[in-house]
Amino acid sequence: GILAFGNVGRNVARIAAGFGMEVYAYDAFCPKEAIEAAGVKAVDCQDALFETCDVVSLHIPATAETKQSINAALVGKMKKGAVLVNTARKEVINEPELLKLMEERADLKYVTDIKPDADADFAKFEGRYFSTPKKMGAQTAEANINAGIAAACQINAFFKDGCTKFKVN
């Protein structure tokens, strides 16, 4: 299951499908038709995603609405033996609630590329918990070169045509 079907979510879905996985997705801002056009099954709400999937991969931004939104009530809906994968932001996870749920459910697994604040507490779930010390998603040589090229192209487009396509504020 893919929570948030932006660029990263779409790529994860494509890779998962390449392994023969049946892929589901939910994105509050992406039309179901766009999800289905990518060969992915759209669900109506995030609860349905967590109830349906053996693995849920998070790709949501950390906003006022999403911070702490991945909580025990939501993760508790996951199937027996399910895996929660967080490659989004650590702020979206309600760590105290997830810790408590993992105490209660010995079948639940959590994988993250962002070391949680409560890493020492999660460490007791050896074999069911894995994290990396820092977010590595975009820290490859190729990604850094591409980011530099993209920034240069955007600056050039602004001065040449007044293009503000990627304006942040």
Model-identified regions with their sequence ranges:
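Glycine-rich Rossmann-fold phosphate-binding loop(s) that bind the pyrophosphate
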Residues: 5-6
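Conserved SAM-binding motif I beta-strand of class I
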Residues: 25
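Hydrophobic Val/Ile/Leu positions in short beta-strands of Rossmann-like dinucleotide-binding domains
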Residues: 1-2
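Gly/Ala-rich phosphate-binding loop of Rossmann-like dinucleotide-binding domains
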Residues: 13, 17, 102
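N-terminal Rossmann-fold NAD(P) dinucleotide-binding loop
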Residues: 9-10
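Rossmann-like adenosine-cofactor binding region
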Residues: 30-123
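Residues at the starts of beta-strands that form the adenosine-phosphate
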Residues: 21-22
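C-terminal helix-to-coil terminal segments
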Residues: 109, 116-169
